[in-house]
Amino acid sequence: MQAFARLLDALSYQPARNGKLRLIEAYLRDTADPDRGWALAALTGSLDFPAAKPALLRSFGEERIGAELFHLSYDYVGDLAETLALIWEARPDTGPPPSLGEVVETLQRATKMQTPAILKRWLDS
């Protein structure tokens, strides 16, 4: 998951189309299956996790620091994932973060009731 996060970060700062293609090509070349396939699916918008939607993530932020402060922070930062990353303190004793494949496969199997606990556990890692 960390390598995919680095790819997304690099893509966001790369203005040139060919530069973006080189970044994606390098990632796909250096990444083993199934993460390579899941990354391609994510980049093309083919993944859907019915139980993990932005409203659920917003509710985590509101619980964490209060609704008003979260909305002010989100408005200032402008991106939900970035806002959560800035306000969510990782706990050092939670182990390594999951791989991209683990994230996708777990969220595909998770029920609506299981998803919040899974996502919070990952945010803590």
Please provide the spans of the model-predicted regions:
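N-terminal nucleic-acid-engaging modules of covalent nucleotidyltransferase systems
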Residues: 1-125
